[in-house]
Amino acid sequence: MWKLFLTIILVFASTAVKANHSIVVYNVDTNTVIKEQNAWTVRPIASITKLMTAIVALEHYKLDDKLVVRKKQYATAGTLLTSLLVRSDNQAAEILAKNYPGGRSAFIAAMNDQAVKYNLPNTRFIDPSGLGVFNTSTAAEVAALVYFASEYDFVRTVSAQPEIYTVVKTKYGYKERPVYNHTSKELLVEFDNILLSKTGYTSKAGRCITMMIEKNNQKQIIVILGEPTKQRRDNLARQLIAQNSL
């Protein structure tokens, strides 16, 4: 299906869109491109990289595997993946990579191998966090990456949570308190049909977000790359969630 999707969007891609950002809105169930702008522009994707980090980690680790954080300090793979997807934790990405067989370089190689497997020729990773300017892709290929990431129950469940809670003991008894706030918390609180969400930002990548939503009992993938401000990115996301349906 995704080879067909990438072919369709290449055929119908705009050739002269006067916009600095890249956009794709894609209906998964009908295999229909609803909207696209600069869908094949190769650009940095910042922390959207972490979707591939999560895929490679979930293919190798069990959620209760204990990974070395530093000498005599450990964290489970599940805890690190939660921090990775909710807080967009760069350190969690590095720990997941360093504990991989063969270390960090082997983990990054596995990320790029997975991109080849998914038929994403313009997608390249040089680190597990997305901080590097050469972690690049296109809006079209990010949409495909979101689809593949959504096949993992853990990614869907965790990345759609506005907050992750923990139980702490206080003088008034045990209470739930948020331990992680999602980087797209405002949108996740505002809309109850977001099934997966990941943001990204570096000075070179701009403000980025990708989501899978459910609308009219059909799944849609939204990708926005390269907006100059968080407010503009989120307002555009609101418009695309509210307006587009096929």
Which stretches of residues belong to each language-model region?
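Active-site-adjacent loops and short helices of periplasmic peptidoglycan-processing enzymes
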Residues: 16-153
